[in-house]
Structure formats: C-alpha cells, structure tokens
Amino acid sequence: MIATEYPRPPLAGIDWNHLGFEPVEVNGHIESRFSPSTKTWSTPTFIPDPYIRIHGLTPALNYGQQIFEGLKAFRTPSGSITVFRPDQNAHRFARSARAVSIPPIPTDIFLEAVHLAVGMNSEFVPPVGTGAALYIRPLAFASSATVGLALASEFLFCVYVLPVAPLHKHSGENDKDRKKRGVRALVVEDFDRAAPRGTGDVKVGGNYGPALGRIDAARQEGYGLTLHLDSQSRSLVDEFSTSGFIGVRKENDDELKLVVSDSQQIVASVTIDSICEIARGFGWAVEKRSIAFTEVSEFVEVYAAGTAAMLVPVQSVERRSTGEFIQYSVDYAEPTSVFAQLYKALSGVQQGLVPDQWGWTQEVLRPKQLASQDTEADT
C-alpha cells in the first residue's frame, strides 16, 4: 500500500491569492453527539459532506440555543500544518455552552474534532506566502425537538473548515490603500449589541444576527467596520461588530501603550490576548480598562483584532449623531508603525516564520481516519 501524502499539498485549481470569506466545498465536516443517557459526547466522526439533518422544531432553530467559535490553521515553511491557540478557543466554547444550557464540550473532544477537521481537509490549507489560512468554525446546538421553553436533551457539536483571506481584505479600500491607511469605521447608534448582564461576552448567534443589516448598510457607504458603544451609557467603547478594539497611546516620553477594553459585555479575544503578550515582549505597556469614546481621538493608532480579521488598521472613526470624525494620519504600511510591528510578529508566529516562544501553535498530525481511507483505497 502507498499511503496518501500528508499533509496533502494545496489543491490545484484554487486561486489562493484571491480568496474571499465565502464557503468553499471541502471534503467534509466533523460531528459529535451528546448522549442524554450517558451524559457524554461521542468520539468525533468525519462526515463527507457539509449537510446536517435536524428536526425543524429544535430549540436551536426556534430559540437560538446555539454557540459557535472561530480559529485558524496555517501551512508552515517546513510543510507542517499548525492550529493557533485552539486550547483557548476550547475554553471559550465551553463558557459559551454554559451560558445557553448546552453541555460543555470537554477540551480533549474539542481539540480532537478540530485536529480531525483540519487533517481530513489538509489540501485546503492555503500555501505559505499567500496571507490566507484555513478558517475553522466549531458550532454546537440543541438538536432534539421541543416547542415548549424547556431544556433540550440532545445536542450536536460540529466543526467545519474553509480556506479564507483575512476578513477585511476586501472592505471598500483597495489593498494598497488598506495596508497604508486602514479602513473606515462607523459608530452604530440605533442598535445596542449587548445588554448589561446579557450574552455579549459569549459567542451566540443572537449577538450577531441583528447587526448583519447594519454592517451591510455601512459597507455600502464605504465603511469597513462598525463600532459598538456600551448599551448603558453609550459613552464607552465596547467592540467592533466583527472584532475587538485596540487603541495605541504615545505618552509624553514617547512610551507606547496598548489600551484594550475590560467591558463585561464583549467576547474575550484570543487574538487581542496574543497581541498584548507580543506588545509586552516589545517592552510596551498594556492597559485593560474602560475606554471612553472621548479618548478615541487621543490614540495614535487604532485596530480591529479578531480571528477572522486578524489585525485591521483603522483610518477613521465617525459618529454621526455628534458630528465627530476622528482620523488617524499614520502610514500603517511603514515598518516602524506599531501596527506593522505587531502584525509581523503575530503573523510570523501563526505561519511558522518565527519561533513560537509562547507555545501557542499545535501541529496537526496525520489523522487515523486518513490512514483507514488509504487502506480501503488499496484493497
């Protein structure tokens, strides 16, 4: 028997330099089911298609009892494939599950499913040097049928993958201008993303569905980002619709300081946590605290940060109700900009271009299921 090459090389026929953020047909997805009798999740299984058959009266479809995650895998110069900080996503996924009464997926099951999804679709991991990645979307939901507002007994955990470009690569600016000046941001003022003591700090669809129309409307006007303020006072920065907020201050002695929000209504960002660690390694200060909107004009650089977006420089922030228009004149493409230094360091670790001194990446080894397919093909 001749074993299939692993990792498989990038699939021919895909234009890796011009990916978007839309689904691509891959080999399949992963499923694990929760047993109400044993109170355990099953061993993750590879399903060779993208479809799920469920009852139309599940609490997931009717009452929003569902959660999701997002992380990425990269192909490295050595030829291996790695996933970036999946353990942190596992912890966040479990926290989201508890928030909507879904049995938390154990970390080992989560990691096994993620590694299996990537390994069984290794030819869809983009080549080195394209800036693209394999986006990984874990999701879980109540799958048993019930019309009444009662706890479900059955649940399904899935992991999907798709090759993608950075989320805001095509956000109204041409690529050259986006890298140099950043994207425009608009403050959302007719809608509160999350309520105090609500679900803003977990990844549930209800936090995102109502924002979709506003994101699209802003995009039609040339804004690549929409920014949310706190729902209680509307005076504090919460986060962008798709990612977290980072501001950079330059103190009188030219000391650099990254400022991130400590709001209890936002999702804990793995990307922001990583960027803050990198900044500390550069000797820069990091503050996690409330950010008044009035302070936004005092920052010398501003970014949106998240798994899908990675790190996106912001050109301007506009708040129409007050007529405020805050513009940042920095050349983000300049290698000495704070953005350029952080982006290079983060992408370097993710793509295996620099040593991973933090132990953030996990190599995806050859799945046992792939070996089984080789055996079947040989017989």
Curated annotation (Swiss-Prot):
Pathway: Antifungal biosynthesis. Keywords: Aminotransferase, Pyridoxal phosphate, Transferase. Due to their effectiveness as antifungal agents, echinocandin derivatives can be used for the treatment of human invasive candidiasis. One of its GO terms (biological process) is branched-chain amino acid metabolic process. Its cofactor is pyridoxal 5'-phosphate. Belongs to the class-IV pyridoxal-phosphate-dependent aminotransferase family. This is Transaminase htyB. It comes from Aspergillus rugulosus (Emericella rugulosa).
